């Protein structure tokens, strides 16, 4: 857990499916905004790197994406993303202005057990990037969204209806096919949850 940033997703108790959806939406928006601004990829968005703080259930957040102002609910949980050690981003205009971590230097990262979603996610990232870690490949963000949805379904216990569970399972499946967090933001599970307005 991070002192000022809240408790990590691994250790916090979610109260309901609305909190789970709001958490996923906030992570998706944050990644999509960073993709647009800096061609950002987190590349290590496991449960310990998603911090949650309790806030007012009616609190909303705002973000600017593609020239549009987005407003979206927290449902009582504010998200902070931490640990950018493995991340990739553009810091300028030239190829030499890319900050990234060469994950090939840590082969153990790819040797975790098959069927373990976090280990599988590292391997899926390697396949998506073709092992060229400086290259911008926002699909890695979508792969971590799939991972987070998987963890919500398999590792976290909170009340949800059959319909809410089906929505989460559907998002998990669709996230594997998305090319970016920006694309995931338009998922059926999120459409109608966030609002937009031209600035």
Regions inferred by a protein language model and the residue ranges of each:
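Conserved structural core of kinase catalytic domains
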Residues: 1-20, 91-102
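Structural signal for hydrophobic/aromatic residues that build the beta-strand cores
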Residues: 2, 9, 27, 31-34, ...
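Amphipathic alpha-helical protein-protein interaction segments
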Residues: 13-20, 43, 74, 131-138, ...
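Conserved kinase catalytic-core helix
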Residues: 15-42, 47, 56-57
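C-terminal or late-domain output modules
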Residues: 30, 49, 54-69, 75, ...
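Short, flexible/disordered secondary-structure transition segments
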Residues: 38-47, 52, 57-59, 92, ...
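Catalytic activation segment of kinase domains across protein kinase-like and atypical kinase folds
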Residues: 41, 46-124, 128-131
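Helical subdomain adjoining the active site within ATP-dependent kinase catalytic cores
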Residues: 114-199
């Amino acid at each position: 857990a991070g002192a000022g940033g809240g408790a990590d997703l691994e250790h916090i108790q979610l109260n309901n499916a609305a909190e789970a959806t709001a958490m996923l939406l906030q992570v998706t928006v944050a990644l999509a905004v960073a993709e647009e601004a800096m061609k950002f990829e987190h590349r290590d968005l496991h449960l310990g790197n998603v911090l949650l703080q309790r806030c007012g259930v009616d609190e909303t957040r705002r973000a600017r994406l593609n020239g549009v102002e987005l407003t979206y609910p927290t449902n009582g949980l504010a998200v902070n993303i931490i640990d950018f050690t493995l991340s990739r981003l553009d810091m300028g205009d030239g190829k030499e202005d890319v900050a990234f971590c060469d994950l090939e230097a840590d082969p153990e990262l790819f040797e975790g057990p098959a069927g373990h979603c976090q280990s599988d996610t590292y391997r899926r990232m390697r396949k998506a990037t073709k092992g060229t870690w400086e290259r911008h490949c926002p699909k890695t963000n979508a792969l971590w969204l799939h991972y987070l949805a998987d963890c919500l379904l398999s590792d976290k216990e909170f009340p949800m209806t059959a319909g809410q569970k089906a929505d989460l399972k559907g998002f998990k499946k669709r996230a594997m096919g998305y090319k970016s967090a920006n694309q995931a933001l338009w998922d059926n599970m999120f459409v109608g949850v966030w609002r937009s307005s031209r600035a």
